[in-house]
């Protein structure tokens, strides 16, 4: 990668963030598309977020990606927020142009793009275990793509909190979003029947041992099973699903595709998907579910 007096910057902003693989993805894409930009990881404190965003303008940066815990905190400091990001209530991509900062959320589209090309969410039944993090973004994008039915399972103590989030969303988008108690086995067994896409968005399993469901849980036949985690590459949730013959995917594809959408928003160039994906698999083999 050539760096000279004309090189611009982009960054991912969060804390912690030095472990991120986003710099690898974006810098590979810049190199393959002859884009004179370097992408860095900025680990900043909460009280430095506004100042960091101001640097996007001052340094005429291409933009930035925002990771947890700052996806909501950046909203007041933006000049404009894309409609989908407004519905989701968080931003993971900021484009800087002529001193103006525009916020987007590419998480939901990134996840849907990571699904097998033979799978369409149109008129399908979607069930999510957990409603935090990227779950709202996935729900909004699934609705945009014509999902038929949405169910979310959350901890009983969080039901009221998420009801307050998803009820207005359901009304605005005119789609039924039903919340359930994750601790109720009867609700889970009844609701899971006929599910086309089941997503673990709880974070349980990143320790390599915990499960968001009972060990004797029976996955619906023909159901595509996803986990938003990508380390370990195969969580206990995905392992259990595979043992029952289900098709599975982890969260690496979502991370990759949300980065691809962000790259295109920032550069107005086509993301070199196949080349970067192959490079990513070689650089981070431990994150890849299918070798």
PLM regions and their residue ranges:
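Short, conserved loop/helix-junction motifs that constitute active-site signature segments
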Residues: 3-4, 121-122, 144-146, 214-223
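Adenosine-phosphate binding glycine-rich loop
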Residues: 224, 228-291
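Phosphate/diphosphate ligand-binding glycine-rich loop within oxidoreductases
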Residues: 2-119
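Residues at the starts of beta-strands that form the adenosine-phosphate
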Residues: 9, 125, 148-151
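Conserved S-adenosyl-L-methionine
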Residues: 144-149, 244-247
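Rossmann-like adenosine-cofactor binding region
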Residues: 176-248
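Glycine-rich adenosine-cofactor-binding loop
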Residues: 14, 103-105, 115, 119, ...
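NAD(P)-binding Rossmann-fold cofactor-contacting core
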Residues: 147-173
């Amino acid at each position: 990668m050539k760096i000279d007096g004309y090189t611009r910057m982009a960054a991912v902003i969060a804390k912690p963030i030095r472990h991120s693989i986003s710099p690898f993805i974006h810098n590979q894409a810049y190199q393959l598309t002859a884009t004179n930009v370097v992408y860095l990881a900025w680990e900043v404190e909460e009280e430095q977020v506004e100042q960091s965003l101001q640097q996007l303008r001052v340094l005429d940066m291409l933009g930035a990606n925002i990771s947890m815990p700052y996806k909501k905190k950046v909203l007041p400091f933006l000049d404009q927020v894309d409609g989908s990001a407004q519905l989701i209530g968080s931003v993971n991509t900021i484009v800087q142009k002529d001193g103006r900062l525009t916020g987007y959320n590419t998480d939901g589209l990134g996840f849907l793009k990571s699904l097998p090309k033979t799978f369409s969410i149109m008129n399908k039944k979607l069930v999510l275990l957990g409603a935090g993090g990227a779950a709202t973004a996935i729900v909004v994008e699934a609705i945009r793509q014509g999902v038929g039915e949405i169910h979310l399972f959350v901890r009983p103590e969080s039901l009221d909190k998420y009801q307050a989030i998803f009820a207005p969303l359901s009304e605005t988008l005119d789609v039924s979003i039903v919340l359930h108690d994750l601790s109720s086995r009867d609700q889970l067994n009844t609701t899971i029947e006929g599910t086309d896409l089941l997503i673990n968005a709880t974070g349980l399993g990143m320790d390599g041992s915990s499960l968001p469901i009972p060990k004797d849980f029976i996955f619906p036949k023909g159901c595509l099973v996803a986990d938003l985690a990508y380390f370990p590459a195969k969580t206990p949730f995905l392992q259990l699903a595979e043992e029952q013959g289900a098709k599975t995917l982890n969260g690496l594809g979502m991370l990759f595709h949300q980065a691809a959408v962000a790259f295109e928003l920032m550069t107005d160039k086509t993301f070199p998907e196949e080349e970067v994906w192959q490079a990513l698999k070689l650089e981070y083999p431990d994150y890849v579910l299918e070798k």
